[in-house]
Amino acid sequence: MGKYVLGIDQGTTGTKAIVFDRKANIVSSAYSEFTQYFPQPGWVEHDPQEIYDVSMRVVKEALDKGGIDPNDIDSIGITNQRETTVFWDRRTGRPVCPAIVWQDIRTAGRCDELIAKDGKGIVERTGMIIVTNCAAPKIEWVLKNLPEVKAEVDAGNVIFGTVDSWMV
């Protein structure tokens, strides 16, 4: 059984890695920010590869600071930045387009259309309210606006999810 638990807080502006001992004491930690992109008003994007690289760097730094052998990590917990949406090649694990951040409001018009058409019904069927920070309208936006990504999704080569599912 490992001696430590690693927590990764992959947040909206940076990533923190914290190593805890078996008594929940913090042994070591590391943090680093990554780049925010604002290509248009209301749009917020991240480079998923940069998120991954920063995350791996802070994990290594936290382990090094604590003098911890990676084999002594018993489990890893990941928390992430809400509904930020990543599309990646299932064969390589590489992202195929920028991540659309949960704060991004490019899907506001589409969300308004869905609410007007069947907002109450959607909530009743799914338990989810229709808002721009959810992944579903972001996924639809990518599939409608990035034909090269849609073609790869249709071919079964590209999959999508939130940051935590991609990092795992």
Question: Which residues are covered by each model-predicted region?
Answer:
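N-terminal glycine/serine-rich phosphate-binding loop of ATP-dependent small-molecule kinases
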Residues: M1-C97, E124, K144, A151
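Gly/Ser/Thr-rich active-site cleft segment
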Residues: G2, Q10-T12, K23, I122-V168
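General structural feature for long, well-ordered alpha-helical segments within catalytic domains
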Residues: K16, I51-S55, T107-R110, K138, ...
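Generic alpha-helical secondary structure signal
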Residues: R22, V27-S29, R106-G109, E113, ...
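Glycine-rich phosphate-binding loop and adjoining helix at the ATP-binding site
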Residues: V86-N145
